[in-house]
UniProtKB/Swiss-Prot annotation:
It comes from the Bacteria. Its EC number is 2.7.11.32, 2.7.4.27. It is an enzyme of class 2 (transferase). Belongs to the pyruvate, phosphate/water dikinase regulatory protein family. PDRP subfamily. The keyword Ion transport does not apply. This is Putative pyruvate, phosphate dikinase regulatory protein 2. Keywords: Kinase, Nucleotide-binding, Serine/threonine-protein kinase, Transferase. It catalyses: N(tele)-phospho-L-histidyl/L-threonyl-[pyruvate, phosphate dikinase] + ADP = N(tele)-phospho-L-histidyl/O-phospho-L-threonyl-[pyruvate, phosphate dikinase] + AMP + H(+); N(tele)-phospho-L-histidyl/O-phospho-L-threonyl-[pyruvate, phosphate dikinase] + phosphate + H(+) = N(tele)-phospho-L-histidyl/L-threonyl-[pyruvate, phosphate dikinase] + diphosphate. It comes from Listeria welshimeri serovar 6b (strain ATCC 35897 / DSM 20650 / CCUG 15529 / CIP 8149 / NCTC 11857 / SLCC 5334 / V8). Pfam families: Kinase-PPPase (PF03618). Bifunctional serine/threonine kinase and phosphorylase involved in the regulation of the pyruvate, phosphate dikinase (PPDK) by catalyzing its phosphorylation/dephosphorylation. ADP binds at residues 151-158. One of its GO terms (molecular function) is phosphotransferase activity, phosphate group as acceptor. InterPro entries: Kinase-pyrophosphorylase, PPDK_reg.
């Protein structure tokens, strides 16, 4: 019988760095049950740390730590070694290497990544921009966008806009519908800022049927019919050609993967 995988994330900040890495690793295994990731954030003293480590020991878990402060990191490492708890320190090997290379000492400030600096406020502004100009609510926003995503319905325009906004990109998106004229503003911006999104008819039909079902509508609606989908995709390709923009196939790609392709294309022009 397969043993459950319980992973304790122990961090003196949010702990999301460790979570991303753990998900990347566990995705490589065909587990019967998803790994049980238990995140303990903002651990800033030995008492809270010991309580979490004792819990990990009782659960026969794996400890993944991102403790910036050396005393806490060393305490966790020693405890795990003494109690035969698998322990991965994601920060200190790299921290030591950077210190050795630069001659500088780490600030050991767990909140340093989350300072309310200009980068933070730029990200908030980008998120607000993505919300304001989602689904081409106001075509004037296309002029000021860093990236404009164009595609038929259900090609991940909105989630990609949100994801890229969290990386400080100002993103607007335009739905392509054969019956609705393309906004003039789309032809007034450099085509290297425009990314066309498309997919296969089969994948689009599948996604649209799921969407219709989720909102209680008939899955056999024209919205998910083969004829309508082929018409829309053809219209999409014609539009991409007119715009002279790069095109990405989004089928079977995670949002993160598509976003990485988009940023690679956009930055290649600068």
């Amino acid at each position: 019988m397969e043993k459950s995988v319980i992973i304790y994330v122990i961090s003196d900040a949010i702990g999301e760095t460790a979570q991303h890495i753990i998900r990347a690793v566990t995705a490589q295994f065909s587990l019967n049950k998803p790994a049980d990731i238990r995140r303990h954030a903002f651990i800033r003293d030995e008492k809270a740390l010991l309580e979490t480590l004792e819990e990990a020991k009782a659960a026969d878990g794996i400890v993944v730590q991102t403790l910036v402060q050396s005393p806490l990191a060393e305490y966790a490492t020693d405890f795990c070694a003494q109690n035969n708890i698998p322990n991965i320190d994601l920060l200190h090997t790299l921290t030591a290497a950077v210190e050795a290379k630069t001659g500088l000492k780490s600030k050991q400030d767990p909140g340093n990544m989350r300072r309310l600096d200009s980068n933070y406020f730029d990200r908030i502004a980008a998120i607000e921009f993505a919300v304001k100009y989602d689904d081409c609510k106001d075509p004037r926003g296309l002029i000021d966008a860093d990236i404009v995503l164009v595609g038929v319905s259900r090609t991940s325009k909105t989630p990609l806009s949100s994801f890229l906004a969290n990386q400080n990109w100002k993103v607007a998106n335009v739905p392509l519908v054969p019956e609705i004229p393309i906004p003039d503003e789309l032809f007034q911006i450099p085509n290297e800022r425009i990314i066309g999104l498309t997919t296969t008819p089969e994948k689009l039909a599948q996604i649209r049927k799921v969407r219709l079902k989720s909102i209680g509508l008939d899955e056999s609606s024209s919205y998910s019919s083969e004829k309508r989908i082929l018409e829309e995709l053809e219209y999409g390709y014609d539009t991409f050609k007119k715009l002279g923009c790069q095109v990405i196939h989004v089928e079977d790609k995670a949002i993160e993967e598509t976003a990485a392709l988009i940023t690679e294309i956009i930055t290649s022009y600068h």
